[in-house]
Amino acid sequence: MSDAAGLTTLAEMVRDRAKTRGDAIAFEFEGCTTTFAEFNIKTNRVGNGLKALGVKPHERIAYLGKNSDLYFELLLGAIKANVVMAPVNWRLAAPEVAFIVEDCKAAVLFVGPEFIALVRNILDRLPSVRAVITTERGAPECRDFTAWRDAQSTDDPDVAISPKDIAIQLYTSGTTGKPKGAMLSHANFFNLVQTGSDADKPDWNKWTPDDVSLVVMPVFHIGGSGWGIIGLYHGAKGVIAREFDPTKVLDFFEQAGITKLFMVPAAMQFVVRQPRARSVDFSRLKYMLYGASPIPAALLKECIEVFKCGFVQMYGMTETTGTIVALPPEDHVEGSERMRSAGKALPGVELAILDPDGKPLPPGEVGEIATRSGSNMAGYWNLPEATASTLRKDGWLRTGDAGTIDKDGYLYIHDRIKDMIISGGENIYPAEVESALCDHPDIAEAAVIGVPDDKWGEAVKAIVVMKPGKTASVTDIINFTRERIAGYKTPRSVDFIEALPRNPSGKILRRHLRDPYWAGRDRQVN
């Protein structure tokens, strides 16, 4: 169900699906269902409500909450008013949340019930926020979302929208430690989903009216919001999980008849290792799409045995609106060299391997992975220099990942040129963790690296140099850091060293610290 010829904006998509799939279920969340026709009306109300609050086209709103059907009402309702949604990672510490909300100059902050206390404590640091609306009752100082929405007109907001306008702003961590808002346009999303007719698509990329998609990755990730939008585009039913819980994921398979889903490998491991996983009926499951971090071969083999469906590895990033490379089910052959690859470029996506000067390298040589397609982001919000260093004038986006392309077009990822750590699908930059570590009164300097971890892919390891005559326990350092940054960024282990290795210019030689932990592995990511 993907006939959407002539549509150029996500607002048009919602209207079209209300006409063509009106009585079908768009979303199911914790026992409540919303049809496509109802979704169209609810998003009209949200768009009109934002207009009534004085939110102008191209302004931002923010959402701090877990997955819900209301989030997608907000996202698409804002889009109808040409307002940009900026979902916030709810795992972040209060200062990090405040930075994102104020960085995007959110006019309205929508907040889930679990985070009202956090918002109350940082509200004085959010001068741009004109209203706070809670998605569930229980906060007297906040407006109630349902009451606010239902008081609005059901008429279409009727706001002019261009395909080049920004639809969503997703924050991705920066090498300086400050998150960057990647601006994704309507055109970016349509380039992602409109990859030719169904006749030209591989089976794993085809959708039917009977498909049931599970939205289980957090909506502040492209794997959450983007996956939800893809399901809407195809007119499929989307079952929304409030947050990832492996036992509930198994319940969804049994009760909702899930046919497609996207998960990160760490989540797959939690699900497949559940005691009842081997007794669950997965017969309706057609394809499991996975990505955001590589998957250990042993885990993939176990998942294939248990889920008994087609597997598709996805490679992409927030800045490319998600997937640009896919390894299809037919290449998931145990012992095959291609199992080490990330797959081949999707239709309409160009790939290149560049040398340090930005010149293309021949097949088999290692360099920086670059990509060019209509899915490349519009840029980073209010960061022209960062945008220019990532997006070249000729349209090529430099990923910061190192890899090779073989003669058949398969992409092999070797390492990250940037120092980012991926733990359980979450992006973590060493500079941010190092900054928190160096606030410790007894630490002279610190370096942070990612080390192999069977559960999370990579785990954060801190390597610290103590000040002369000072000592601290591993537990003390970890607890100190946890008070300053999100829990998933906190080091899982700490090593002590007399001096950090540096090159003549004084730059820390992070590779020297990492190499002992990655010895004997094909690639320096896990």
Model feature map: region roles:
Residues 48, 52-53, 80-148, 468-470:
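Structural core segment of the AMP-binding/adenylate-forming
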Residues 50-55, 59, 155-164, 169-214, ...:
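Conserved adenylate-forming
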Residues 190-212, 220-259, 273-274:
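Conserved AMP-binding/adenylation subdomain of ANL enzymes
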Residues 2-7, 23-68, 72-76, 93-98, ...:
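Conserved AMP-binding/adenylate-forming core of the ANL superfamily
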Residues 92, 98, 109-111, 253, ...:
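AMP-binding/adenylate-forming catalytic core of the ANL superfamily
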Residues 1-8, 140-166:
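Flexible, low-complexity linker/hinge segments
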Residues 350-370, 407-408, 470-474, 509:
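Conserved beta-loop-beta connector loops within the AMP-binding
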Residues 233, 255-263, 272-336, 350:
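Gly/Ser/Thr-rich phosphate-binding loop
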